[in-house]
């Protein structure tokens, strides 16, 4: 064990572990605290073995004791721990940390007294401090001295590596925090400039901070040179020169010169101390840069402990660049002033200037449960004492009767009042208004002249542009924006054209307006001129007088002393009367006070004569601004304004004038080069106009946004609430400010009639209607505001979509209304108003197209139109209504578009209805006449989804809970020519589950109209590589069995029909069959295709065969259709084949390659065709790959069509991630490359079973593991890696799969590991399905084995080796081995082909004796070779070709040694 852990013996360790960390706490010291302390020793250049003895602990305390009052939390914790160890070594009995610290403080004071006594004794005896070795300590008295005197010479002692290491570690850990300055002071005590530069040089990674320090050094050095000019003339011999600024910085002086200036010069110049002061100034600037929080911003939180607040306060005050007096003033005033109300009451009771220890002791536990209990006990005690005083002879003042503030009756208080809460003013008690609008309140929310002139009522509206808002009592003009803007600042300003606006208030006879504008999101500081001297001062309306720092201003003339009251007490100032002050363009005369103020202040004595206005309102800066920019390389819109009628121009002028007053838009001039056209339309009531802006060009140039809300909330997903309220955020977009840097792009122009003058140009200050970024920015901003409100109002459930709010709660009506009012107040504080006229308090609530009640919900009334003539547009609207109604009305059909005749038409063209469409329309109208209602979601109760099949390939489903309908939906089959209803059913299941996850976040229990045996029979052979949940099987007639049965093996003793067909380019063809027993039939077809002829041949074989039949075909097209077992098809020929196959008992359908000399197939080919087609495969590989990427045909089709070897065709399919999968899935395909595996853990009989599946083949590896940990998972993965090649592993994101052990195995085995979301159909589809199949197999064989482990392994054997099906009709093991061997054959074939391509051929053609070439060898056969000369492929007899290797450099033709024909008879 290390030194820190062995600092105490067993007895001392027992005593140490019984000491509590805090007096009232339960936690005690542990050995981990010793280990931590040992690691912290190195920061202070101390060895950790000092913790092992009493003397060592005392040395540590001597180092830490001076730093403890201003140290960090870690330093204080270390000091406390060392104090406890000191007491343990000293055998002092202590119970907690405070007792140990008290004992150590006493000891430290004793040590300090002894040291002072020894120092005094030594000085009186010898006059100089000496150590035992005769080395004199420098005059500074510090123990960290870098110089020692030996005899009459001073010798420099460099800084120790431990000191430099401590300095570097402090900077690295604190990052120029406030602790760096005292740390530097402590480590550089008594250092020379050389040593200080050495400390700076070791900070190599902080060049930015060092540059700041360097600039401060240069400035101070220049000031030193100015204040200390060099003496004129040469220096006398032997005299030491005076140090210059660069000498103090150590750049032009030696170490010996620095020592002489410090210790022997006359007068002595302590260059080290001067240089330290310069460095400290630079470090303070760095601290301010790295800690931008001002001490003025440090305020105690409502639940923050006073001790934490004090720590933050002192950390910030150490970072302030101010003198000690100012910091002392800040500490005395701000520490109490910025405390929370609870602590402030206690601190004010301590009297003037309490010590920090008294404040910490008094505020200990404030805000906690014990403190609250104590306050409640004191209050109850006071109440009881008052009651006893009244009972004892009616002594004391009698209590007045209790009166309710809400209803005015006596006998109860407001919180006990049963009547509804009334809006009443807290100031005057009158109903009808709140305190913020009270006229009896002095100058509240009014435009206030400082000199006390008459004021006007203030209109609480937003104004970002600086214009004055209209009065709240003004007459509403009929032409104006439809909604009010929320509250904000309103103030006057000068327009961009330079014209001064009229003021609406009385200004004491001075027609000046407001002389300047300053936003209040920062301190209003302005440069003023006092007697011609520029002074930066704070404009403070709360200060009576103007007071300036003495260092900033020197005034001459008579003055008189004065004492003024401040936050920290009285201040002695000098009063100068009748002094000239210039603020902006106003020249005033008044009284100036000069004194020790922390900041210059302009008070009301000078502000009042200037007649300014103070406008108080809600600041729009509270709402965060979302930055927006244009796309890369795009520019803003520059579209000319089109002509408008006079009526529209006047309407736009009225609207924009109102918008400008409310601050939503502001005027711009011609310097803005962008423009967007505007126009206006009449509203629905035809009495008002609405302004519209054509932002199409700006939307094209604006950056892309992502809709943060991907859909509208559905009422079926809402929980049932006792109370509901629906709110609407009024003028939603106009409540959110637009990025100031983007506003210029929204500029628009209102033209004038007949171009009688220039148009008036504006730009938006808030989110405009019609701009692409407005919805996203509003959604994101409103969501962040509501997130904080939801935390403060947990009793409310708030659902937001854009500006519509659904608010529900389980409270009673009175409490609910109170909570909603709190919500509206909080939204109002952010500038989001909820107008009363759009607030819905009584059901039914209109919300998002629904009608809501507390116990149910309905769709708004849907009425189908009755028209004589219908256009395409009318039909589209009708289908949209039916789709919307289908979420609650079951049985609706939307096949009207397909049933209407006429083909594709324009939107306004008339369409003709078919009888089927009219019948469907009438049926839908009847369904909509009945009232349907949905219920709300009840958590904890399972949801069931019932599926019903409709006519025309449509499906309907209902979500129910306890028999009540939550929601209804419908599903239509995908657009496929040949479909299987079971496959459609699987797609429907996935749609239902996805919809349930979106709305409720859980999966429903499915009720499907199919028998279990029927489904499992189909699913066993045609399972999807996707996830299918559990469901209940409901037997209904439609899907009992609607498809035919295909057997896996030939039917014995039954005739075999070989079908074939041929088609010519003239659209004429033949189709027929020949049977094993000699039957044959051939028919001539007209106007057909080869595919149709193949299907016709199969139909003929089915017509002429018995109940059991074997059919062999060479058509991949026909084979692909029929093996999918479709139940319906758009092709009449396929429908006839399906009907014939359903009548059969057993059908064996097999494919063989065409034109390969296979018996039966060759005979039928001769009957229907002449000649065969041969294609060389090597030139067709790229074409085959392109065709496969487009149509995804299988490898057999590729090999047959393009004449490719099987291994080449299989490789093309294997390279496609969409095709190398099991079955024929429609959705949810996963990557099934040859090396891809999926792994998951499942549970069986309370044991963990880990399963891995090879995706491409379905091969399973599984075993029982003791625990679901990363170690066991890694061991299982290593077993599989030792047996099979793995290149990619896909799992879910469980902790065992994301562990370090699994990551290490994947790294070692070069396995790409990906994770996905559990139950996602596109993630773990294969493994989820295999888990289900494995459990089904185990259930069938569980009785045959004793142990679960044996059952799992036996199930793997049965699945891998005993079941055939899927791709190629093989077992999983055969398929996996086939995939691996195919990979090896491909590699071998590629090597062989590459070798062949390395040969060159010289050849002769016909009777031409000239040898041609060289050509590229493509293929070498027994009697001929295939070569490529240029772009031509040629077949040349073997005897007319000479093959040579392509050596470099090329060989000559006459070199017979390289000619293949000269090497022997084998060639």
Swiss-Prot record:
Mg(2+) 3 binds at residues 1240, 1292. Mg(2+) 1 binds at residues 728, 803-804. The record marks 1018, 1031 as: Essential for RT p66/p51 heterodimerization. The viral protease is inhibited by many synthetic protease inhibitors (PIs), such as amprenavir, atazanavir, indinavir, loprinavir, nelfinavir, ritonavir and saquinavir. RT can be inhibited either by nucleoside RT inhibitors (NRTIs) or by non nucleoside RT inhibitors (NNRTIs). NRTIs act as chain terminators, whereas NNRTIs inhibit DNA polymerization by binding a small hydrophobic pocket near the RT active site and inducing an allosteric change in this region. Keywords: Aspartyl protease, Capsid protein, DNA integration, DNA recombination, DNA-binding, DNA-directed DNA polymerase, Endonuclease, Eukaryotic host gene expression shutoff by virus, Eukaryotic host translation shutoff by virus, Host cell membrane, Host cytoplasm, Host gene expression shutoff by virus, Host membrane, Host nucleus, Host-virus interaction, Hydrolase, Lipoprotein, Magnesium, Membrane, Metal-binding, Multifunctional enzyme, Myristate, Nuclease, Nucleotidyltransferase, Phosphoprotein, Protease, Repeat, RNA-binding, RNA-directed DNA polymerase, Transferase, Viral genome integration, Viral nucleoprotein, Viral penetration into host nucleus, Viral release from host cell, Virion, Virion maturation, Virus entry into host cell, Zinc, Zinc-finger. Specific enzymatic cleavages by the viral protease yield mature proteins. The protease is released by autocatalytic cleavage. The polyprotein is cleaved during and after budding, this process is termed maturation. Proteolytic cleavage of p66 RT removes the RNase H domain to yield the p51 RT subunit. GO terms for biological process: DNA integration; DNA recombination; establishment of integrated proviral latency; proteolysis; symbiont entry into host cell; symbiont-mediated suppression of host gene expression; viral genome integration into host DNA; viral penetration into host nucleus. It catalyses: Specific for a P1 residue that is hydrophobic, and P1' variable, but often Pro; Endohydrolysis of RNA in RNA/DNA hybrids. Three different cleavage modes: 1. sequence-specific internal cleavage of RNA. Human immunodeficiency virus type 1 and Moloney murine leukemia virus enzymes prefer to cleave the RNA strand one nucleotide away from the RNA-DNA junction. 2. RNA 5'-end directed cleavage 13-19 nucleotides from the RNA end. 3. DNA 3'-end directed cleavage 15-20 nucleotides away from the primer terminus; 3'-end directed exonucleolytic cleavage of viral RNA-DNA hybrid; DNA(n) + a 2'-deoxyribonucleoside 5'-triphosphate = DNA(n+1) + diphosphate. A lipid is attached at residue 2 (N-myristoyl glycine). This is Gag-Pol polyprotein. It comes from Simian immunodeficiency virus agm.vervet (isolate AGM TYO-1) (SIV-agm.ver).
């Amino acid at each position: 064990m290390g030194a820190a852990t062995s600092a105490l013996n067993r007895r001392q360790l027992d005593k140490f572990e019984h000491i509590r960390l805090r007096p009232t706490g339960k936690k005690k010291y542990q050995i981990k605290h010793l280990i931590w302390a040992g690691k912290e020793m190195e920061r202070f250049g101390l060895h950790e073995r000092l913790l092992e003895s009493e003397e060592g602990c005392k040395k540590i305390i001597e180092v830490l004791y001076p730093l403890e009052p201003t140290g960090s939390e870690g330093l204080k914790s270390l000091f406390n721990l060392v104090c406890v160890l000191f007491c343990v070594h000293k055998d002092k009995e202590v119970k907690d940390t405070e007792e140990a610290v008290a004992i150590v403080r006493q000891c430290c004071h004793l040590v300090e007294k002894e040291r002072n006594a020894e120092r005094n004794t030594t000085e009186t005896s010898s006059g100089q401090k000496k150590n035992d070795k005769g080395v004199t300590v420098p005059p500074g008295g510090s123990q960290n001295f870098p110089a020692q005197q030996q005899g009459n010479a001073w010798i420099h002692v460099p800084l120790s590596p431990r000191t430099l290491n401590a300095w570097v570690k402090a900077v690295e850990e604190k990052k120029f925090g406030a602790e760096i300055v005292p740390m530097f002071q402590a480590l550089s005590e008594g250092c020379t400039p050389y040593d200080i530069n050495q400390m700076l040089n070791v900070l190599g990674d902080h060049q930015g901070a060092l540059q700041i320090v360097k600039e401060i050094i240069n400035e101070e050095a220049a000031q030193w040179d100015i204040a200390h000019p060099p003496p004129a003339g040469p220096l006398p011999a032997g005299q030491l020169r005076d140090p210059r600024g660069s000498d103090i910085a150590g750049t032009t002086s030696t170490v010996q010169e620095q020592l002489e200036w410090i210790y022997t010069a006359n007068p002595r110049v302590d260059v080290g101390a001067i240089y330290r002061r310069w460095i400290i100034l630079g470090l303070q600037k760095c601290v301010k840069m790295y800690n931008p929080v001002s001490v003025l911003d440090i305020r105690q939180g409502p639940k923050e402990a006073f001790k934490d607040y004090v720590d933050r306060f002192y950390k910030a005050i150490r970072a302030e660049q101010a003198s000690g007096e100012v910091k002392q003033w800040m500490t005395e005033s701000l520490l109490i002033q910025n405390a929370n109300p609870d602590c402030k009451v206690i601190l004010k009771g301590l009297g003037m200037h309490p010590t920090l220890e008294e404040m910490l002791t008094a505020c200990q536990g404030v805000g906690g449960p014990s403190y609250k209990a104590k306050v409640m006990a004191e209050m109850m005690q006071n109440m009881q004492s008052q009651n006893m005083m009244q009972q004892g002879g009616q002594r004391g003042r009698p209590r007045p009767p209790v009166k309710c503030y809400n209803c005015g009756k006596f006998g109860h208080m407001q919180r006990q009042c049963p009547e509804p809460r009334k809006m009443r003013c807290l100031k005057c008690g009158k109903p009808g208004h709140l305190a913020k609008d009270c006229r009896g309140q002095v100058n509240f929310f009014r435009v206030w002249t400082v000199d006390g002139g008459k004021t006007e009522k203030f209109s609480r509206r937003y104004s970002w542009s600086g214009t004055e808002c209209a009065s709240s009592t003004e007459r509403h003009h009929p032409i104006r924006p439809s909604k009010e803007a929320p509250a904000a600042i309103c103030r006057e300003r000068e327009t961009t054209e330079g014209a001064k606006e009229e003021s609406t208030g009385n200004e004491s006879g001075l027609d000046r307006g407001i002389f300047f504008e300053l936003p209040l999101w920062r301190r209003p500081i302005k440069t003023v001129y006092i007697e011609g001297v520029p002074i930066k001062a704070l404009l403070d309306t709360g200060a009576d007088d103007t007071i300036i720092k003495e260092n900033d201003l020197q005034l001459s003339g008579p003055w008189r002393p004065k004492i003024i009251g401040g936050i920290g007490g009285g201040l002695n100032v000098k009063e100068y009367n009748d002094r000239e002050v210039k603020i902006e363009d106003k020249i005033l005369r008044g009284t100036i006070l000069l004194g020790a103020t922390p900041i210059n202040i302009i008070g009301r004595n000078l502000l009042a004569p200037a007649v300014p206005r103070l406008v108080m309102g809600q600041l729009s800066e509270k709402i965060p601004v979302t930055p927006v920019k244009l796309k890369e390389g795009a520019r803003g819109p520059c579209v000319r304004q089109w002509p408008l009628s006079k009526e529209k121009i006047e309407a736009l002028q009225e609207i924009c004038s109102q918008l400008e007053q409310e601050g939503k838009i502001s005027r711009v001039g011609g310097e803005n080069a962008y423009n967007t056209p505007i126009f206006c339309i009449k509203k629905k009531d035809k009495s008002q106009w609405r302004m519209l802006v054509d932002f199409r060009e700006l939307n094209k140039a604006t950056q892309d946004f992502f809709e943060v809300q991907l859909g509208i909330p559905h009422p079926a997903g809402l929980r049932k609430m006792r109370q509901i309220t629906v709110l609407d955020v009024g003028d939603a977009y106009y409540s959110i400010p637009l990025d100031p840097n983007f506003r210029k792009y929204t500029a628009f122009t209102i033209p004038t009639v007949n171009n009688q003058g220039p148009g008036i140009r504006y730009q938006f200050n808030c989110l405009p209607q019609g701009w692409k970024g407005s919805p996203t920015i509003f959604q994101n901003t409103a969501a962040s505001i509501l997130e904080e409100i939801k935390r403060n109002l947990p009793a409310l459930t708030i659902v937001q979509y854009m500006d519509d709010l659904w608010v529900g709660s389980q409270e009673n009506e009175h409490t609910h209304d109170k909570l909603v009012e709190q919500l509206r107040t909080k939204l109002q504080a952010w500038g989001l108003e909820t107008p009363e006229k759009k607030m819905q308090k009584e059901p039914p609530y209109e919300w998002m197209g629904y009608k809501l009640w507390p116990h149910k919900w309905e769709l708004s009334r849907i009425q189908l139109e009755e028209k004589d003539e219908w256009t395409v547009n009318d039909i589209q609207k009708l289908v949209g209504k039916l789709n919307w109604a289908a979420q609650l009305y079951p049985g609706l059909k939307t096949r009207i578009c397909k049933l209407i005749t006429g083909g594709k038409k324009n939107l306004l063209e008339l369409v003709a209805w078919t009888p089927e469409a009219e019948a469907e329309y009438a049926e839908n109208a009847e369904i909509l006449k009945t009232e349907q209602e949905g219920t709300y979601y009840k958590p904890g109760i399972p949801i069931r989804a019932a599926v019903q099949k409709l006519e025309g390939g449509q499906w309907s489903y209902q979500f129910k809970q306890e028999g009540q309908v939550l929601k209804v939906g419908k599903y239509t089959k995908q657009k496929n020519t040949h479909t299987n209803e079971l496959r459609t059913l699987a797609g429907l299941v996935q749609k239902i589950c996805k919809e349930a996850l979106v709305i409720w976040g859980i999966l429903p229990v499915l009720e499907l109209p199919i028998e279990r045996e029927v489904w499992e029979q189909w699913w066993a052979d045609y399972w999807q590589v996707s996830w299918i949940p559990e469901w209940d099987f409901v037997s209904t007639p439609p899907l009992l069995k609607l498809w035919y049965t295909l057997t896996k093996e030939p039917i014995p003793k039954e005739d075999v029909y070989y079908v074939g067909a041929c088609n010519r380019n003239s659209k004429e063809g033949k189709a027929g069959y020949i049977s094993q027993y000699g039957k044959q039939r051939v028919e001539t077809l007209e106007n057909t295709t080869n595919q149709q002829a193949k299907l016709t041949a199969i139909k003929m074989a089915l017509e002429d065969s018995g109940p059991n039949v074997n059919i062999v075909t060479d058509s991949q097209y026909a084979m692909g259709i029929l093996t999918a077992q479709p139940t319906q098809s758009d092709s009449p020929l396929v429908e006839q084949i399906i009907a014939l196959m359903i009548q059969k008992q057993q059908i064996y359908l097999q494919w063989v390659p065409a034109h390969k000399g296979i018996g039966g197939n060759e005979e039928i080919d001769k009957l229907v065709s002449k000649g065969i087609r041969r294609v060389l495969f090597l030139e067709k590989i790229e074409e085959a790959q392109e065709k496969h990427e487009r149509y995804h045909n299988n490898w057999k089709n590729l090999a047959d069509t393009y004449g490719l070897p099987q291994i080449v065709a299989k490789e093309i399919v294997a390279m496609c991630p969409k095709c190398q999968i099991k079955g024929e899935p429609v959705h949810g395909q996963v990557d099934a490359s040859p090396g891809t595996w999926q792994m998951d853990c499942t549970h069986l009989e309370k044991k963990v079973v880990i399963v891995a599946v090879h995706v491409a083949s379905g091969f399973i590896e599984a075993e029982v593991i003791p625990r679901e940990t990363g170690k066991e998972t890694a061991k299982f993965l290593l077993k599989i890696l030792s047996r099979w090649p793995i290149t990619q592993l896909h799992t879910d994101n469980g902790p065992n799969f994301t562990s370090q052990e699994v990551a290490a195995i994947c790294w070692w085995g070069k396995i790409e590991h990906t994770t996905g979301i559990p139950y996602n159909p596109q993630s773990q589809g294969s493994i989820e399905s295999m888990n289900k199949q494995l459990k089904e197999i185990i259930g069938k064989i569980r009785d045959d084995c004793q142990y679960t482990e044996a059952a799992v392994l036996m199930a793997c054997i049965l699945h891998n080796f005993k079941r055939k099906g899927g791709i190629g009709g093989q077992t999983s093991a055969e398929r996996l081995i086939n995939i691996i061997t195919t990979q090896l054959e491909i590699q071998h074939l590629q090597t062989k082909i590459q070798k062949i391509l390395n040969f060159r051929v010289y050849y002769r053609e016909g009777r031409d004796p000239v040898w041609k070439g060289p050509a590229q060898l493509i293929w070498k056969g027994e009697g001929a070779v295939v070569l490529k000369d240029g772009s031509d492929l040629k077949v040349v007899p073997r005897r007319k070709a000479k093959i040579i290797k392509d050596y470099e450099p090329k060989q000559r033709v006459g070199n017979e040694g390289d000619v293949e024909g000269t090497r022997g008879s084998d060639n």
